[in-house]
Regions:
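Short C-terminal tail/terminal secondary-structure segment
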Residues: 2-5, 151, 240-264
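Short, small/polar-rich loop/turn modules that mediate ligand/substrate recognition or access, typified
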Residues: 92, 178, 183, 239-241
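Substrate-binding pocket helix/loop in short-chain dehydrogenase/reductase
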Residues: 102-103, 110-112, 209
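C-terminal substrate-recognition "lid" of short-chain dehydrogenase/reductases
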Residues: 123, 217-246, 251
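Active-site helix of classical SDR
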Residues: 126, 162, 170
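Alpha-helical segment proximal to the catalytic Tyr-Lys
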Residues: 131, 175-176, 237
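Residue(s) in the substrate-gating loop at a strand-loop-helix junction
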Residues: 146
Length: 264
């Protein structure tokens, strides 16, 4: 069955957005190691091509430059995936952007851009990929959300709201597509050692996160990728409509960060 094939099956195909770096690239690497053929999509064409060339088996991967917020680009990219591989078994909606500003300083243009990428993108990619999955019996979709969608904090009005909405979109997708053989789940990462985190997390924020997370550390892109891989695997064949927090216990602890409670 499509999307539930045994690890290493030569026919299986995964589409990953935001795949040029970080969690997206780690996820592409995971799928390749599991025997999938992989389509890597990203808006940053040069970085995407360089990342794809550096993969261990680039012959089983294609790189497609795509802005997931634009329907024509999404549809064109998925058509190219079908031409190259003939099918799609898994879709990982990872592409995302963030604006870290107080509510009253966030412009409407910034708000709309975050919503366009973080929410419209998964909607459009699902609409484009799901019909292809149905041709071979179904598949699996994983949306990359965030603990910022589970908890509110300052400076995340657009980002946090977009991720909370993505979690509900996940449930809507799961309910509507489940009967068709497509499972949909979300992963809500906690702090992860990515380039974006290194740029926006000050030493004080990093120290507070380590103090608030029971495992006392940031996660790695590879750990998030393995979580995504599990949700796309036969081991998760009865998991549908769930949001899995991969956060070292941060959400369970209920401890906030003083550095993110400053006055806006």
């Amino acid at each position: 069955m499509s999307g539930e094939s045994a690890t290493g099956h030569p026919a299986t195909v995964a589409v990953i957005t935001g795949a040029a770096r970080g969690i997206g690239l780690a996820t592409a690497t995971w799928f390749l190691a599991a025997g999938y053929r992989v389509a890597l999509l990203d808006i940053d064409g040069p970085a995407l091509k360089a990342a794809t060339r550096a993969l261990k088996d680039p012959s089983r991967a294609i790189a497609l430059c795509c802005d997931v917020s634009l329907q024509p680009e999404v549809e064109a990219a998925i058509r190219q995936v079908v031409v190259a591989f003939g099918r799609i078994d898994s879709l990982v909606n990872n592409a995302g952007v963030a604006i870290f500003k107080p509510l009253l300083e966030t412009t409407h243009e910034e708000w709309r851009r975050v919503m366009a990428v973080n929410l419209d993108g998964p909607f459009l990619c699902t609409q484009a990929c799901a019909p292809v999955m149905l041709r071979t019996g179904g598949g699996s979709i994983v949306n990359i959300a965030s603990i910022s969608g589970l908890r509110a904090s300052t400076l995340r009005v657009a980002y946090g709201t977009s991720k909370a909405a993505l979690m509900h979109l996940t449930r809507q997708q799961a309910v509507e597509l489940g009967n068709l053989g497509i499972r949909v789940n979300a992963v809500a990462p906690g702090p992860v050692e990515t380039e974006m985190a290194r740029q926006v997390h000050s030493p004080a924020i990093r120290a507070d996160y380590r103090d608030a997370i029971p495992l006392a550390r940031y996660g790695t892109p590879e750990e998030i990728a393995a979580t995504v891989g599990f949700l796309c695997s036969p081991a998760a064949s009865y998991v549908n409509g769930q949001v899995l927090a991969a956060d070292g216990g941060f959400d369970a602890s209920g401890v906030g960060l003083p550095t993110l409670r400053r006055k806006a």
